[in-house]
Amino acid sequence: MSTAVTEGIEVTVRSTFRPERSEPGRFLFSYTVRIANQGEVPAQLVSRRWIILDANGEREEVVGDGVVGQQPHLEPGEHFEYTSFCVLKTPHGSMRGTYRMVRDGGQAFDATIAPFPLVVPGTLN
C-alpha cells in the first residue's frame, strides 16, 4: 500500500496479484485507488500519468484523460475510488505517477501517486 498527500489531495493505492488471470510471462495485478479531498477547496481530476517498472527495468509510461472514463470532481471531504489493472512480464515490479488536478478557480497541480509494489506472493524474500 502507498499513500501520498499533495495540496490536500490524498491518494492511497493497494495492489493485488490475480493468479486466475495470469500465466507464465504475463502477471496481472489489480490496484484500487482512493482519492480523497482533505483540503478546503474543490478539485477535479483531469488526467493521469503512470510510470510502470518491471523487474527487468523495462519502463512504460501511460498518460490519459481522467480515470476509468471519468474526471471526478471532489468537494472538500469527498472521495472517489476505482479499481484498474496492470500486466507485467515479470513477477514483480512497481507503479507510481501523478494525477493532474484543477481547482475550481483554475489552479492546476499534480497530486503524487507514491510508488507501490506489484509482487507475486512468494517471489521476493
From Swiss-Prot:
It comes from the Bacteria. SUPFAM superfamilies: ApaG-like (SSF110069). PROSITE patterns: APAG. Pfam families: DUF525 (PF04379). InterPro entries: ApaG-like, ApaG_domain, ApaG_sf, Uncharacterised_ApaG. Residues 3-125 form the ApaG domain. HAMAP family: ApaG (MF_00791). This is Protein ApaG. It comes from Anaeromyxobacter sp. (strain K). The gene is apaG.
